[in-house]
Structures are given as structure tokens and as C-alpha cells.
Regions:
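Short coil-to-beta-strand transition motifs
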Residues: 96-104
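Flexible loop/turn segments at secondary-structure boundaries
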Residues: 61-66, 72-73, 113-114, 129-132
Length: 183
């Protein structure tokens, strides 16, 4: 996950009290990593293996559902209302303006000709084939940075320091913490 609040250090395991998918089963725990690390992992999986990558995001901001687009500059709310809407990711989570609320799959990535700049991501959504491009959306790279909170990648992609962190006790967050909104 990319848990953006300063009190949740990157490279540490976090858990949510009372969050589990099976009674008596293993607790749901996450490794808190920088958003760029998540992007790099997803891009590598899509580019080298061509397999979809599960992720969780706040799917509502800056979304054009009909046309299937997510972009940070899709709408100019600040210009229309004369109000500054420039909270960063940490502030949006802290003040309950953003949380993971929907799971989808990355199925493609658009890389610029320079080979290093990611422009867009192709997303398979679960809302049916009558919206967007037969159920597929396009996400710009800045939107990923701002609204994607978790990805599922194989442990084999983790550096030693992150693998070691998985062996440490988790920082436990309360049941109502936004990082537990999508289990």
C-alpha cells in the first residue's frame, strides 16, 4: 500500500484491527511502500509478463465514467467554484476526503518513446461492458499517484529490506482507518 500519512513510515508492515477475510484466519496486513515503487512493480509485470495486476483505488475523483477516463486535470472545479481543491494525497486521507473504495485490474501500460516515462494505464473495471470502452478505462499516470492506494505483486519483486520488514510486527491501525476500507 501507499499509506501516505507521515506517522506510517514507508518500508513498514501495517495492519488494521479486526480486519480479516476469514474468521480465525490470518490477519490482513500490508507493506507500506512509496507510490513510485508500486508503479515500477506494476509496469514491470505488465511489460515483461503481460499479466493483469489487482489494485485498489479511490475511483470517484476526476472520473468520466461514460468515456472511461481518470485524469487529475479532467475537471476544473477550482476555476468553476473559485475554491482551491489542492489537498495532497496525505491530506485527503487524513481529512476523510479519500480512501480505497474499489478494486480493479491494470491490464496495460503506455510508455513514451523515451522508454522511461509512463503516460497512461489501461484498467479493466467490473462495472460491465456498456460503459467506457467495453468496460476498459484509461488512467493517466498522475491519477495513479494521487488515487491508487494498493497493488498486489509477488513477494519476489521486493528488495531484501522490504522482505525483512514483512518479518517484523505490524503497526496496527484502528478498525476505522481509511487504509482498511478495501480489504
Amino acid at each position: 500500500v501507499d499509506a501516505p500519512r507521515a506517522e506510517h513510515p514507508k518500508g513498514r508492515k501495517i495492519g488494521i484491527e479486526h480486519l480479516g477475510n476469514v474468521v480465525g484466519g490470518a490477519a490482513t496486513e500490508y507493506l507500506n511502500v512509496p507510490g513510485q515503487f508500486m508503479k515500477d512493480c506494476v509496469r514491470k509485470i505488465l511489460s515483461e509478463q503481460g499479466i493483469p495486476v489487482w489494485f485498489g483505488a479511490d475511483c470517484h475523483p476526476m472520473m468520466d465514467r461514460k468515456n472511461g477516463a481518470w485524469a487529475t486535470d479532467l475537471f476544473e472545479y477550482g476555476r468553476v467554484y473559485g475554491v482551491d481543491f489542492d489537498l495532497d494525497k496525505e491530506q485527503r486521507v487524513r481529512f476523510a476526503d479519500s480512501a480505497m473504495n474499489h478494486a480493479m485490474a491494470f491490464v496495460g501500460v503506455d510508455v513514451a518513446d523515451d522508454g522511461s516515462t509512463t503516460r497512461r494505464w489501461r484498467v479493466e473495471n467490473s462495472w460491465g461492458c456498456k460503459i467506457a470502452d467495453k468496460g476498459y478505462f484509461t488512467m493517466d499516470d498522475p491519477w495513479f499517484s494521487e488515487f491508487v492506494y494498493e497493488v498486489a505483486v509477488p513477494k519476489s519483486m521486493l528488495p531484501k529490506e522490504y522482505l525483512d520488514a514483512l518479518e517484523e510486527p505490524a503497526i496496527m491501525l484502528p478498525a476505522w482507518d481509511p487504509m482498511g476500507a478495501l480489504a
